[in-house]
């Protein structure tokens, strides 16, 4: 900020700084002693520009004099390491180390922010200063922990007796020495060789030593204390992400990237850099990573990978409703990085000079190699500098991680002042021009967008035509006999013309509609497809990014029309949750259904894009994953790609993957406040989730809720390990409450699942989570027959192996009790009659697939009776929780004749499939009785044979009429 510009500080900033200075003078007058008029004015202005600087100097006013004693003029980066090592030399406790690191970080960041706001540091210098500070904090923290742990546990050694260090890869902007002010730091921990510690009380495996050290280092840097934090640490870029070990050896790292490394990990590794003093281990680490990142040949496949990654980022921008985002939006910072990294990955194998972590260094090399023209280099550099300066200043205002332009006048004034712009309008214009240039170069590099002249297509005329005669003539010319189409389109167009969608939205809609109409008229009856398709468009009318998505992706338009025609339920989902439109872009990916065993790993991968500590985004991501996968299942269902028998399997395995993540998130949130139950060993939870009903029976439908029961295995009265200790039983209660909260909270993407806990012991009046032995006692001594029927369909879906084994024992024991067949028949039939009286509401001549006599419920009751009546003699009947395999087992044991079992299975599958189909058509689960008479009559007859006739049921003859 020049002297001239300092004189033009806006009034609001001046007043804010003046009030702060007056308060400081009143409380700490000694801190201003010795400052001249120019220095006081600069202090006042900077306090008005940055809440973070003002806050930090209010806490430590003694630092003001130090800053003016030469610290603002230049930064000696080598001093960071020296001063931190001196400060930590006499520290003996982790809490003290945390305080030292945080206070040093805050002081230096205030100093660097001051230099940014006053124009004392060019961008490159500022980013290098922040990166050097971050590296010094990480490495001195690492070295202090290493010394402390070696004293207590011994020193990790390789087979030849050489000490082994913890090596840290700095990823992203930290690796490139381009870290911005409030960025997370992405790290990967590794060590050279396996071995054991020497010199401690007992030897410890090197990997275990370094995992403990890594956990403590993450905590040392990221835990929030009274002094704040050093950096938010993200470890999810390590091999296998969150599910992988925190620290792996060099050889394991090399094996992973050679065998399983993915395209996005190649991009991440372009900027990877071993932190700390360079050593032979640093060389070794970079050498083993190089073949994965840089291929020996010119690798144009990197372009397609980049397109996919950019597509994912665009999806995130839409899903998170990000506007004015100068990092992720079109033409943002990330697109510059993509342009440069794509060239690095394509040619870095042949051109060693491109193997640099520095973006500016790579751009200069690309120019010298003739890969970028001077104009492109000049535009990309200048645009990037403006956006990075704006990003850095935005974050330095209040030490917050943001890339979004301000939403208030004061912060706009601060930004304009620091960037020497007259006003918000001028700065916006400069930023928009910069982003337009970046996006132009990005498109020139990666392409992938559709170019088509709509004006030459008849549908452009049809969309714009005003006269009915002209519209009808256009349809006749195309041999389209659908008189209802033009009135529908005309009415919709008139309605939309009154909607305030802005000039950009209007222009995009006018480009989209001819293309969408081209897809619509390919349907057998275009007017029949009009309402579901255009309802989706109407829902995204004010979300221009989604209109652009449909405009630029012919595959997405084709899938939108075909799926909306095939299923009103899918159309409804797309209208309610527009982010699902992203899934339509690539038809091959849409119909590439996740395999049953991969839902868990897919979900873990999906959650990598979301900050671990952002609970709201984590909850939203879970819902978006569910909606996305559900859409893929439904799309494959209605098009016949997925056999209808497998639909429930996929919906069930999807739910189980989500349950696992919800429990882990809930556990982390409760444990962060209270610690964990003290009786647990590492990796244990002592907690289990039991599925009942459709989830337990592996028969989940599209709209099914989850019947769950929670169990734990602690009988004592111990406490948790955290600072806010609570009783273990109370911990598990809080865990259950948090799980239910994560499921039921309604976010932008709705509720995750509706969870029904009424099947727990004592129902709605019982505890939310039961101790497992108490659960067993309840089932043996207090549960009603209908609760044992429910237990037939129960299944362990999450938890410790010990709990899984004990639950299986309890379930088998309860189901295997000796029961009086006559009494059991009476109780089962009474419950079925009661259910029918409450739930069966059907018009004459119609058949309710679930509740009508001969329907799904009758089949389920037959299965439950067979298990309860026969398990005392035939233990195999307790193995399965799903109806189909219960009937198969009953046939194998000669409890049911094979033809009868086959008839029940056929009827059950048919009725369930019809129910799926009706759900996708958004219709009630009812059909004309005649349509299912063959199956229902057989079921009624078998029900009567197994359980006996009900006196209040009509005879079979009248039911079949």
UniProtKB/Swiss-Prot annotation:
GO cellular component terms given for this protein: cytosol
Reaction(s) catalysed by this chain's protein: [glutamine synthetase]-O(4)-(5'-adenylyl)-L-tyrosine + phosphate = [glutamine synthetase]-L-tyrosine + ADP; [glutamine synthetase]-L-tyrosine + ATP = [glutamine synthetase]-O(4)-(5'-adenylyl)-L-tyrosine + diphosphate
Pfam family, one: GlnD_UR_UTase
Keyword Magnesium assigned: yes
Region (Adenylyl removase) location: 1-450
Enzyme Commission no: 2.7.7.89, 2.7.7.42
GO biological process assignments: regulation of glutamine family amino acid metabolic process
SUPFAM superfamilies per record: Nucleotidyltransferase, Nucleotidyltransferase substrate binding subunit/domain
Source organism, top-level taxon: Bacteria
Adenylyl transferase: annotated span: 456-961
GO molecular function, one term: magnesium ion binding
Cofactor entry: Mg(2+)
The entry's keywords: ATP-binding, Magnesium, Multifunctional enzyme, Nucleotide-binding, Nucleotidyltransferase, Transferase
Enzyme class, UniProt record, top EC level: transferase
Task of the protein: Involved in the regulation of glutamine synthetase GlnA, a key enzyme in the process to assimilate ammonia. When cellular nitrogen levels are high, the C-terminal adenylyl transferase (AT) inactivates GlnA by covalent transfer of an adenylyl group from ATP to specific tyrosine residue of GlnA, thus reducing its activity. Conversely, when nitrogen levels are low, the N-terminal adenylyl removase (AR) activates GlnA by removing the adenylyl group by phosphorolysis, increasing its activity.
Family stated for the protein in its record: Belongs to the GlnE family.
The protein's name: Bifunctional glutamine synthetase adenylyltransferase/adenylyl-removing enzyme
Native source organism of the sequence: Shewanella amazonensis (strain ATCC BAA-1098 / SB2B)
Phylogenetic placement of the source organism: Bacteria, Pseudomonadati, Pseudomonadota, Gammaproteobacteria, Alteromonadales
């Amino acid at each position: 900020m020049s002297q001239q510009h300092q004189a033009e500080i806006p009034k609001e900033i001046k007043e804010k700084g003046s009030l702060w200075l007056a308060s400081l003078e009143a409380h700490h007058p000694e801190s201003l002693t010795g400052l001249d008029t120019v220095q006081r004015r600069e202090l006042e202005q900077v306090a008005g520009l940055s809440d973070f600087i003002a806050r930090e100097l209010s806490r430590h006013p003694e630092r003001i004099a130090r800053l003016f004693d030469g610290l603002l003029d230049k930064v000696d980066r080598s001093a960071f390491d020296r001063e931190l090592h001196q400060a930590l030399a006499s520290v003996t406790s982790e809490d003290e180390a945390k305080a030292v690191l945080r206070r040093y970080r805050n002081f230096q960041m205030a100093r660097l922010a001051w230099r940014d706001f006053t124009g004392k540091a060019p961008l490159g210098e500022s980013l290098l200063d922040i990166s050097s500070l971050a590296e010094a904090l990480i490495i001195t923290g690492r070295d202090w922990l290493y010394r402390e742990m070696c004293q207590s546990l011994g020193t990790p050694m390789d087979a030849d007796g050489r000490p082994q260090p913890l090596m840290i890869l700095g990823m992203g902007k930290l690796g490139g020495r381009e870290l911005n002010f409030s960025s997370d730091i992405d790290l990967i921990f590794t060590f050279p060789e396996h071995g054991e510690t020497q010199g401690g009380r007992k030897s410890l495996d090197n990997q275990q030593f370094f995992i403990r050290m890594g956990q403590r280092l993450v905590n040392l840097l990221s835990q929030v204390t009274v002094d704040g934090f050093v950096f938010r640490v993200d470890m999810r870029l390590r091999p296998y992400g969150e599910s992988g070990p925190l620290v792996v050896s060099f050889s394991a790292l090399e094996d992973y990237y050679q065998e399983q490394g993915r395209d996005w990990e190649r991009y991440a590794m372009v900027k990877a850099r071993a932190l700390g003093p360079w050593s032979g281990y640093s060389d070794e680490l970079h050498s083993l990573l190089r073949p994965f990142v840089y291929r020996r040949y010119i690798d144009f496949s990197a372009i397609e990978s980049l397109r996919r990654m950019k597509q994912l980022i665009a999806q995130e921008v839409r899903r998170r409703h990000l506007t004015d985002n100068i990092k992720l939006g079109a033409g943002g910072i990330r697109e510059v990085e993509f342009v440069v990294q794509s060239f690095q990955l394509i040619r870095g194998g042949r051109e060693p000079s491109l193997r640099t972590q520095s973006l500016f260094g790579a751009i200069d090399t690309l120019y010298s190699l003739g890969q970028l023209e001077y104009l492109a280099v000049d535009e990309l550099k200048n645009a990037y500098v403006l956006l990075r300066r704006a990003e850095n200043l935005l974050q330095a205002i209040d030490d917050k991680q943001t890339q979004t332009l301000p939403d208030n006048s004061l912060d706009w004034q601060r930004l304009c002042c620091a960037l020497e712009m007259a006003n918000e309008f001028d700065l916006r214009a400069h930023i928009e021009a910069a982003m337009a240039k970046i996006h132009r170069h990005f498109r020139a590099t990666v392409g992938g967008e559709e170019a088509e002249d709509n004006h030459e297509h008849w549908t452009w005329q049809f969309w714009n035509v005003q006269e009915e005669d002209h519209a009808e003539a256009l349809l006749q010319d195309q041999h389209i006999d659908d008189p209802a189409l033009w009135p529908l389109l005309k009415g919709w167009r008139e309605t939309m013309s009154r909607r305030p969608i802005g000039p950009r939205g209007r222009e995009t809609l006018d480009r989209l509609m001819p293309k969408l109409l081209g897809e619509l008229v390919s349907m057998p009856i275009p007017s029949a497809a009009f309402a579901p398709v255009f309802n989706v468009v109407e829902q995204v009318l004010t979300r221009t990014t989604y209109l652009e998505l449909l405009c630029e992706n012919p595959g997405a338009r084709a899938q939108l029309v075909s799926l909306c025609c095939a299923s009103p339920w899918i159309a409804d989902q797309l209208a309610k949750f527009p982010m699902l439109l992203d899934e339509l872009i690539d038809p091959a990916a849409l119909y590439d259904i996740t395999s049953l065993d991969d839902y868990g790993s897919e979900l873990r991968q999906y959650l990598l894009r979301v900050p671990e500590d952002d609970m709201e985004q984590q909850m939203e991501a879970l819902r978006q994953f569910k909606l996305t996968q559900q859409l893929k299942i439904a799309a494959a269902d209605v098009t016949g790609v997925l056999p209808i028998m497998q639909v429930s399997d996929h919906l069930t395995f999807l739910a189980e993957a989500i349950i696992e993540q919800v429990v882990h998130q809930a556990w982390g949130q409760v444990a962060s406040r209270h610690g964990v139950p003290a009786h647990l060993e590492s990796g244990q939870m002592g907690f289990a989730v039991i599925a009942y009903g459709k989830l337990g029976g592996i028969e989940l439908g599209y709209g099914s809720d989850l019947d769950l029961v929670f169990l734990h295995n602690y009988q004592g009265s111990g406490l948790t390990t955290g600072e806010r200790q609570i009783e273990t039983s109370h911990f598990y209660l809080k865990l259950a409450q948090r799980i239910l909260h994560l499921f039921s909270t309604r976010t932008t993407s709705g509720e995750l699942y509706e969870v029904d806990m009424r099947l727990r012991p004592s129902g709605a009046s019982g505890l939310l989570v039961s101790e497992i032995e108490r659960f067993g006692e309840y089932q043996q001594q207090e549960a009603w027959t209908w609760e044992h029927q429910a237990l037939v369909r129960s299944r362990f879906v999450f938890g410790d192996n010990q709990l899984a084994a004990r639950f299986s024992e309890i379930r088998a024991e309860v189901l295997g009790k000796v029961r009086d067949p006559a009494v059991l028949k009476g109780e089962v039939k009474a419950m079925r009659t009661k259910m029918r009286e409450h739930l069966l509401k059907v018009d004459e001549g119609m058949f309710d697939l679930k509740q009508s006599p001969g329907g799904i419920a009758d089949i389920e009751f037959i299965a439950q009776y067979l298990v309860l009546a026969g398990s005392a003699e035939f233990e195999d009947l307790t193995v399965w929780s799903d109806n189909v395999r219960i009937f198969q087992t009953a046939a194998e044991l000669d409890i049911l004749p094979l033809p009868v079992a086959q008839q029940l299975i056929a009827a059950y599958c048919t009725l369930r499939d019809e129910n799926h189909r009706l759900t996708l058509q958004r219709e009630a689960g009812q059909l004309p009785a005649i349509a299912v008479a063959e199956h229902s009559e057989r079921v009624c007859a078998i029900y009567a044979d197994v359980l006996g006739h009900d006196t209040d049921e009509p005879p079979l003859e009248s039911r079949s009429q």
